[in-house]
């Protein structure tokens, strides 16, 4: 399956002029502690992909941006990265959505996968080395199920009508080590998350489906154990083992996949390949909430990346908003969060431009210290909040933030005749309205309130595709801001992305690009 176009990414080692790796320490769900992540020359990562419907909401984005940041730290340390990601393009939820909407399940899957690709490209996520659909992996699934049947780790239920194949959960004595849940919690999550504990003929309620015998109206493929289709967990197990082997560095995904999905996919690989532990690290992202309620397809309270981008939101603002919380925490998405990220991005861009215009030895020394500190923060369990704070501190020492936000019509301040410094492309969250047209932003103080979601999109739109602004005050009280193109819009090669900047500015912009995927 085709992935998406690779973004232009600054080469970190070329930017900083050194090749000294920084030791990585990442949280491991199985041990419940931060432990060293020590790949060989080739780092190996498997991240569970989407079931292609309702793509791409911010819960998805949070997960894939997180593992993109991990990918970038591995690359900065000089590793080759073998990054594998799947698409669950044959599964019950996909069939149910297609039936609800009256469309073909394959067409729905292809359409939503295309949308996901576009969203990942817009967010600047580095594409996986291998992007594999479950359908194309069915031969690998059949091979693994056959192995599990042959070595006694699986069995066929005694049902002449639907002879499904199940994994014996006792086949691996270490089963449960990843989630560390007790039996009652396992049974609860198994029932809630696609399991069938009450299926007649099973040896144990927690035995998981490997191969579902053909049912009327469902897709099916030939196999030595009858026509049917794969279970959910065996799909990822077969893909991971095929493209990464029986043991690799990181298995990742959202925390709702810890059990049953990741527990079982690891157990299937371990039982089929005779290994004790599939991955060195099991990493999981916290869930994203809207208004304090978890975003979910069932509740329908989803915020979509494509809608934000279509409204003009700078993708870097979306990434930066997600960085405000640690990837393992439960995070709440809000209009204010996105607006704050847009203002922060504008501040950083203005600081880079200011340093570019006034480069000196002290600026270069401070920029290099910043790069070292940001790298260390991210090497410590991807601590993006700490990294963001570090860049904030650096930018705040360069740009007079009081002057930056002292705009006509903002927060009830009086209009000024002129501004003494360039201003970022967004103002603080207020009731003022922004209009974007023909490469200019106009901030209007009409005294009227605006809806929170519209205000967020407008504020975020203000920095869309921009690097810095110049401001012009008018007697009418309007402030018109010229938008200048960001580096990623100029079509530069990765090695030349920041060659137009002074050494200090290039250090900061290149670091933020290479490590965080943000375009300054």
Swiss-Prot record:
One of its GO terms (cellular component) is cytosol. Pfam families: tRNA-synt_1e. The gene is mshC. GO terms for molecular function: ATP binding; cysteine-glucosaminylinositol ligase activity; cysteine-tRNA ligase activity; zinc ion binding. SUPFAM superfamilies: Nucleotidylyl transferase (SSF52374). A motif ('KMSKS' region) lies at residues 294-298. This is L-cysteine:1D-myo-inositol 2-amino-2-deoxy-alpha-D-glucopyranoside ligase. It comes from Corynebacterium kroppenstedtii (strain DSM 44385 / JCM 11950 / CIP 105744 / CCUG 35717). GO terms for biological process: cysteinyl-tRNA aminoacylation; mycothiol biosynthetic process. Binds 1 zinc ion per subunit. A motif ('ERGGDP' region) lies at residues 192-197.
